[in-house]
Amino acid sequence: MKKILLILTVAVAFHNVSAQEITLDKIYSGYYRGKGIAGIASMKNGENYLVIEPTGIAKYSYKTSQKEENIVDGKFESYEFSDDESKILLLTDSQPIYRHSFLGKFEVKDLKSGKTISLNEGKTVQEPRFSPDATKVAFITENNLFYQDLSSGKITQITNDGKKNSIINGLADWVYEEEFGHARQYEWTKNSDAIVFVKSDESQVPEIYIPIYGKKLYPEEMRYKYPKAGEKNSIVSAQLYRLDTGKTMPINLSSFKNYYIPNVIQTAKPDEIVLVTSERIQNASDVLKVNTKTGAVQKLFTETDDKWIDTDSPTLEFLEDDSFLWASERDGNRHLYWYDKDGKLKKQITKGNWEVTDYYGFNPKSKEVYIQTTEKGSINKVVSKVNIENGKSQLISNPEGNNSANFSKNYNYFIETSSTASKPHTYVLKEGNGKTVKELQNNNEQLQKLKADNFVTKEFITIPNDAGDQMNAWIMKPKNFDPNKKYPLFMFQYSGPGSQQVANSWDNGNALWFNHLVQKGYIVACVDGRGTGYKGTKFKKVTYMNLGKYEIEDQITAAKWFGSQSYIDKTRIGMFGWSFGGYMTSLAMTKGADVFKAGIAVAPVTNWRYYDSVYTERFMRTPQENPDGYDKNSPTEYANLLKGKFLLIHGTADDNVHFQNSMEFSEALIQNKKQFEFMAYPDKNHGIYGGQTRPQLYQKMTDFILNNL
């Protein structure tokens, strides 16, 4: 009894001490954790949707919003239906590999018979995919492509030449996965009689090795192929496998732009696959139709740009008459275009000084497309429907904040996920016209906890740069802000091409830490300068061939602007960034040494020659073509300028931005007799997490700020 009372006393004391404060302990204990709805998917009848719950995969009614049943009981990480919804693919155990790839154990359950079959005899596979007729599942293991007959259980091996760090079939290599945004590089035809896949020969790509220290007597090594800027990439080819013959034939792409094959797309036609291909410099992209009976290739059209095309996420949908929709930045903003079946432009569907940021689908009945846009300002994302024939548009989401949608198959309903900078995520069931049916989930409890601990929200402003642009920015001020006082300023940014940090959306990540710093007496701010997204291509692509130049100029300009405000102590301005943001912080502490007193760079690129080919060359061309662009924007070249307090942080097992970057920068600082702090995280990747890593990391950064800014 005495022991229980002691525990209660301690708990009450802790509560009283921290009740009005956002602490790191509370942040990392999950005290402020919000709620969500996992695995939302519409069923083909348009009347029901599914979600993942602790007890299984639950079926709900759109009309009543009530749960009807569990279609599968048990605990699953993810699921995928066959096209006819007779079977379901269940992921039961996964092991992450890189950004998107993972090994997993999968089961297929027949929902009519209740029979369950293990994929690949219960062994791990990658990227399984139902055939459209639901009789088979294709998958990859050890870089080879297979398919399994779901009636007999028979496994057929399609390729035999797969080999680690040499040949990959149907799966992205490291750089494709990282920069084109997906791991699967194969697709079934709609009639299920053929598979088109990409074969990657990475045997000539330079190999990177990373020591893994672990707890063994001798460190192990992680070796994989990583093409750096200007170096050899995988040689890729498109392959056609026909199930009736059991034979594979190469698809001849020699007449087209074929250096990269980022996308393999299934269409509604039974004997057709579409490939999106690109040149190495990524300023021209072909859209190609492949006849899977003959192997013949037809070019629909070529998209070009005088700088680059974002080939990582093309919007392409074929309609019933074989015409198609395509998103392009050709008029200075990302908009939707409609082409006929021969690749001739019919019309531009959306227009204006705003951008289409996501595409949800097309309703053939109403002739409407459903899209997410920045129509209500570049810091907001809203959902609209647009008639492709007459151009009539209707807003169907909240008019501000960050809104996304998950539609029923017939577009009669959708589940809206929305937030603002001051309101956490809410999930609302709506009719297709935007009328609310029911709020499914809110995070009022999370918000009340934060408000009780004096949470402050972001104030949105604009700041001019030297080019005459108005840069989006936010600022967080202490609750008891006194305009007559001078506050130290802590700036955060990312600044990468097409990115956005100044958004009217809820942030469950760094925003809580920033609140912690605000409560310590700091003002925190963020500025999206030139190169960032959602303000048109002129603003985004001005950085071409000079990545880092205009971005750091704008951050320095913004810091000076803040320093000119009466409430900012211009002698106490600091910066923090991760990855590209760490690169910018490194430039701020060197090229901006007279402005910034302290900086924290986490996992920074310090020389673009060390980063991967697809990303870097998209914005910079190769080092051979553009040596000045690479060298004049490397913080290593300006190590002699460092004046302030600098904390450099990197995970030793970073497969993305290699530890080498921080080592080279450190050596340059050392040889210039510069004092700085360095923190290496053993065996941690680009995210630097696991166990108590994040709490320790953020305490380290907090202490550095308190002691040096």
Describe every region a protein language model picked out:
Residues 38-41, 47, 51-56, 78, ...:
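Non-catalytic accessory segments flanking enzyme active sites
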Residues 62-65, 110-114, 150-153, 242-246, ...:
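Short loop/turn segments that connect beta-strands within beta-propeller blades
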Residues 199-346:
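Beta-propeller domains
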Residues 207, 262, 270, 404-709:
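Serine-hydrolase catalytic core recognition
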Residues 100-146, 154-184:
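Asp-box/WD-like beta-propeller blade repeats and closely related beta-sheet repeat scaffolds
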Residues 50-55, 81, 88-100, 137-144, ...:
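Beta-strand C-termini and the immediately following turn/loop, strongest in propeller blades
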Residues 30, 93-98, 102-105, 158-186, ...:
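Predominantly five- to eight-bladed beta-propeller fold
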Residues 1-22, 709:
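Bacterial Sec-dependent N-terminal signal peptides
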